């Protein structure tokens, strides 16, 4: 078969339910070169501060519901529905839902060029 499908219901969330949910779909999709994650952030919740300097992975975040702030060093970028941001591997980042509604994002990561 030349395609696979997956749904967040197919995998366990790696985030405490009170903060939302985070579902890694890479294995469920049998993806080899790209990671795909669905993330839900409840109001007031944050993602983990991190970068990918250790593995050279660049990331793209796409907001599909709600609004989030992505903190990048001394700057905060606000993203709303249908907005996307790409970050280089070495860029420290942290997602925050400072709004009053649940935010939902698709996170995609793969080897940098």
Model-predicted regions and their roles:
Residues 1-35, 42-43:
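A short, N-terminal "cap"/entry segment at the start of jelly-roll beta-barrel domains
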Residues 21-25, 37-55, 89:
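Conserved short histidine dyad/triad with adjacent acidic residue
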Residues 31-32, 42-47, 67, 111-113:
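Short, charged/polar surface micro-motifs in flexible loops or helix N-caps
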Residues 35-37, 59-62, 104:
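Residue-level recognition of specific faces of alpha-helices
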Residues 56-73:
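Glycine- and acidic-residue-biased ligand/ion/polar-headgroup-sensing regions
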Residues 73-90:
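Short acidic-glycine-tyrosine-enriched beta hairpin
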Residues 89-113:
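Ligand-binding loop in jelly-roll beta-barrel domains
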């Amino acid at each position: 078969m030349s395609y696979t499908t997956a749904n967040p219901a197919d995998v366990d969330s790696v985030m405490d339910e009170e903060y939302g949910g985070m579902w890694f779909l890479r294995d469920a999709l049998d993806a080899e070169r790209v990671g795909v994650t669905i993330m839900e952030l409840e109001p007031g919740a944050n993602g983990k501060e991190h970068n990918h300097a250790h593995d050279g992975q660049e990331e793209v975040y796409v907001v599909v519901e709600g609004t989030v702030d992505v903190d990048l060093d001394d700057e905060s970028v606000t993203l709303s529905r249908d907005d996307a941001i790409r970050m280089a591997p070495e860029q420290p980042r942290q997602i925050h839902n400072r709004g009053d509604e649940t935010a939902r994002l698709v996170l995609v990561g793969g080897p940098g060029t």
